[in-house]
Each structure stands twice: as structure tokens, then as C-alpha cells.
Design a protein with these regions (language model features):
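Divalent metal-coordination and catalytic microenvironments
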Residues: 7, 25, 30, 54, ...
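Alpha-helical scaffold segments that flank or form the walls of functional sites
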Residues: 26, 74-125, 129-148, 178-194, ...
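Metal-coordinating catalytic core of metallo-dependent amide/deamination hydrolases
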Residues: 133-271, 275
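Active-site gating loops and adjacent loop-to-helix segments of metal-dependent hydrolytic enzymes
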Residues: 72-103, 158-174, 236-263, 283-286, ...
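C-terminal cap of metal-dependent C-N hydrolases
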Residues: 13, 394-451
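N-terminal metal-binding scaffold of metallo-dependent hydrolase/deaminase domains
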Residues: 1-44, 55-56
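His/Asp/Glu-enriched, well-ordered alpha-helical/loop segment
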Residues: 256-263, 305-404, 420
Length: 464
């Protein structure tokens, strides 16, 4: 049993969105048992006590889209100023040099960085398996470091010789892809409430595999009760390619392939029209909004407030560590808030320029941004047991000291300070009732030798 108490502000994100001054809660066997003002609770004999005076406490953040292996190729000079397709063409040959240790080590580095940003649930999309690499390498890292993990078994089957972008040596044969999807589901997927590990079927995109594999992936995932994930509508180049190749827009093409329903979520969804947003809401699809990556690659601004008004499930993703190039979920929530405000201003400018009436939509608030990073991500991942500090929820929570320089002058609204002020690292991170960050330090990983090994692998890959 763990008793967390005396938080300066406990942000529950429960159904009533309670924010409790002097709040506390009880954790039993990895679950939140009770929540309220700290004076409500008596400390039971033998219980561990976590004193959180002077801290703001929030639910653990949820990352709905990532490529952890890309921590190995951050800020590569030739890829720094490229758009998506040029960026991929530059990095694919480097990624082709990865092996099992590269996948494992990069996953540990990315997960460590995410934990130190307040992220407790990570969904990663691994779609390259060169030189004997397997999804198992990431799973091993997640189990060692202690994060809650959704492992997306990605795939690419169309190499350069078939009109695709990746080198032929990194694509797989489609029967082998399907067999391995079944293997990892049967070996790793845990559908139970409180699960620490789930598996997702996730072709890289509808343009990097055949239409047949997209359809077979739907059948396989639904027969095994797992979710489906892919990239969609990220760039204008993609939209043009889809219309030229298939005679329809990306969303319509995905729906034609069976990629529609509450078990489906897409990464990005930047370039959609007014007719497609209600369709996504009606079918229950979710999306991972990746603001930093979309800005980094000049892909565009996703209409997040339009999605929210329509009732589409929206979570946040830091996306590839080589298209971000960081792993900071609190920063991603801040970026989402600021980019939504920029989109609002641009929509207003365009309306005035065309003489159209502007509805005067409101700006995204700090509390809405935090909701995207918690409950929004939980909904996208099909989870009802994470995203809030409430009885019956998983004991995943994060605490930040408020007496630091970055929050000076911002104590009147500590929650807003988290989003408006410079993003900070947490002092405490707990996942499944287990302390993984204490006093700002990781408890399960020795960082210096890990970083040294990671940098050595990175140099070897980049230098060839």
C-alpha cells in the first residue's frame, strides 16, 4: 500500500475534473483505491508514504505515436531541412544498418527520456526489422524500465523496386509479416484491465504495403481482438499521390480497405476536409496528433479543435525521435495548445480575406491540452483504466515541484504553469504503483553507460 499526500494541487482528470488543494490518494496493488483531501485518510500500519507537499500531481501522460529507434538518428545533417519524403530517403539507408541491440538500446533511451517528461504509457510503431531485429527487442526494454507499453508491429512490403520509398533490403514478404503479427500477439498481448503490455497490428502506411495486406491486417487484428494503427493524411504529397494512384483521398482509401472503426487510430491526419471529420467521429476512429513532427517536417497543422468539436478521439504523440527530435510529452502538450491557437488565427485570417463569416472559436486551454495528453490518449489506445487519478484507475501519476525557477510567479494556477511555462522534468513518476523516477532520477536505469552505448551504435550506423 502507498499513501500519496499533501499535494499542493492534485489534478485528478476524473469525471468531475476535480483539482484538489492538499490532495492525496491511496494506492493498493497498482490501482488507485481512494482520492480526496489528504486529511480524509489515516496512514495504515506498514504503508509507504509519499510526501508531495509543494508539488503539482497529474495523471501519467500517454504517448500515442512514436518511433523509438529514431533516437539513433537525431539531427542528422542531411535530414535536417527535408520534407517527409526527402527525410525518409535520407534515413532509410542508415536505419537499414540497425540490429537487435540497436532496437533494444534505442528503445531504452527513448523510454527513459519519456519517463523524464512525465510519460507513463508509450505506444511505439516499429515497422523495420533489419538484421534479425524483432519487436521482442522493444518489449524487453519496456519490461526492464517499467513503462506501460503498446507495441505496434509495423510492416513495409513495397521496396524501391516496387515503387516504394525504402530500400528493398528492409522490406518483408507479406506472409512473413502476418505470421509474425500472430506470433507477437500470442506471445505478448495482454487484454486485461491494468495490462502493462499490448500488441497492435500496424502497417507503416497504406502506401508502403499492398492493399491486400492492409485488408488482411484488419481481419487478423479483429480476429485476435487487438487494435489497428497506421500513418495517414500526413502531407500534401501523400494526398496527391493517393489521388493519382487510387483515385481518392487518403481517408476514403483507408475506409475502402476496411480501416474504419473504434479499434483504429491514425497518426497525423493533417490534411482532411470538412466532410471527412464527421465521418471519423461517426465511425469511432482515433488520431495521434504530432505537432512537433508536423512542424519539423513542414507537413502542416492538423485541425485539432475541429476534431474535438466533432467528437473524434484525439491523443498526442511525440512521433519519431528523428522528426521531433525529442521525447518530451509535456512539451508536446504545450506545442499542441500553441499550434491550435495559431491555427485559429490563420483560420480567422483566411475567413476575413475571403469575406466569409468567422465563427470565432475559442482558443485551446491548458486544461484541454492536458486532457489530450491523458484521457485523450487513453481513449485513442482503447483504455478505460489510465488517464485519470480516480478509484479503479491504474496507479500511474507524476509529480512536479513548484518551487523551481521556471514556475516563479506562476503559483496562482499551477496546472496552467505546467503548460504555459517552459516544460520541466518531473520529480516523481509512478507506473503501476512502482516508483520509476525519484527526486528527478530514474530508478531502473543507469543513464551514463546507456547513453555511451547508444552514441556508439549511432556513430557506427551513421558512418556506415
Amino acid at each position: 500500500m502507498l499513501f500519496a499526500r499533501n499535494a499542493e494541487l492534485l489534478v485528478t482528470m476524473d469525471e468531475e475534473r476535480r483539482e484538489i488543494s492538499g490532495g492525496g490518494f491511496v494506492v493498493r496493488d497498482g490501482w488507485i483505491d481512494a482520492v480526496g483531501p489528504s486529511e480524509m485518510f489515516a496512514v495504515e500500519p506498514g504503508a509507504a508514504v509519499l510526501e508531495l507537499g509543494g508539488h503539482i500531481v497529474i495523471p501519467g501522460l500517454v504517448n500515442t505515436h512514436h518511433h523509438l529507434y529514431q533516437t539513433l538518428t537525431r539531427a542528422v545533417p542531411a535530414a535536417q531541412n527535408a520534407n517527409l519524403f526527402g527525410w525518409l530517403k535520407t534515413l532509410y539507408p542508415i536505419w537499414a544498418r540497425m540490429g537487435p541491440d540497436a532496437i533494444y538500446t534505442s528503445a531504452l533511451v527513448g523510454m527513459a527520456e519519456l519517463l523524464l517528461s512525465g510519460c507513463t504509457t508509450i505506444s511505439d510503431h516499429l515497422y523495420m526489422f533489419p538484421n534479425g531485429a524483432r519487436l521482442d527487442d522493444e518489449v524487453r526494454a519496456a519490461q526492464e524500465i517499467g513503462v506501460r507499453f503498446h507495441a505496434s508491429r509495423g510492416s513495409m512490403s513495397l521496396g524501391e523496386s516496387q515503387g516504394g520509398l525504402p530500400p528493398d533490403r528492409v522490406v518483408e514478404r507479406e506472409p512473413a509479416i502476418l505470421r509474425d503479427c500472430v506470433r507477437v500477439i500470442e506471445q505478448f498481448h495482454d487484454p486485461k484491465p491494468g495490462s502493462m503490455l499490448r500488441v497492435v497490428v500496424a502497417p507503416c502506411s497504406p502506401f508502403s504495403v499492398s492493399a491486400g495486406l492492409m485488408r488482411e491486417s484488419v481481419d487478423l487484428a479483429r480476429s485476435h481482438g487487438v487494435q489497428l494503427h497506421t500513418h495517414l493524411a500526413e502531407t500534401l504529397d501523400e494526398e496527391l499521390f493517393c489521388q493519382q494512384q487510387f483515385g481518392r483521398r487518403p481517408v476514403a482509401y483507408a475506409e475502402e480497405l476496411g480501416w474504419s472503426g473504434p479499434d483504429v487510430w491514425f497518426a497525423h491526419m493533417v490534411h482532411v476536409n470538412a466532410h471527412e471529420i464527421p465521418l471519423l467521429a461517426q465511425t469511432g476512429c482515433g488520431l495521434a496528433h504530432c505537432p512537433s513532427s508536423n512542424m519539423r517536417l513542414a507537413s502542416g497543422i492538423a485541425p485539432i479543435m475541429d476534431y474535438r468539436r466533432a467528437g473524434v478521439k484525439v491523443g498526442l504523440g511525440v512521433d519519431g525521435s528523428a522528426s521531433n527530435d525529442g521525447n518530451h510529452m509535456l512539451l508536446e502538450a504545450r506545442q499542441a495548445m500553441l499550434l491550435a491557437r495559431l491555427k485559429l488565427a490563420e483560420d480567422e485570417r483566411q475567413a476575413h480575406a475571403s469575406g466569409a463569416e468567422f465563427a470565432g472559436a475559442v482558443q485551446m486551454t491548458a486544461r484541454e491540452a492536458l486532457e489530450l495528453a491523458t484521457l485523450g490518449g487513453a481513449a485513442v489506445l482503447g483504455r478505460k483504466d489510465i488517464g485519470a487519478i480516480a478509484p479503479g484507475m491504474c496507479a500511474d501519476f507524476v509529480a512536479y515541484k513548484l518551487d523551481r525557477l521556471a514556475f516563479a510567479g506562476a503559483r496562482s494556477d499551477p496546472l496552467a504553469a505546467l503548460l504555459f511555462c517552459a516544460p520541466q522534468q518531473p520529480d516523481v513518476v509512478v507506473v503501476n504503483g512502482r516508483v520509476l523516477v525519484q527526486d528527478g532520477q530514474l530508478t531502473m536505469v543507469d543513464l551514463p553507460p546507456l547513453i555511451e552505448r547508444h552514441n556508439r551504435i549511432s556513430r557506427e550506423m551513421i558512418n556506415g
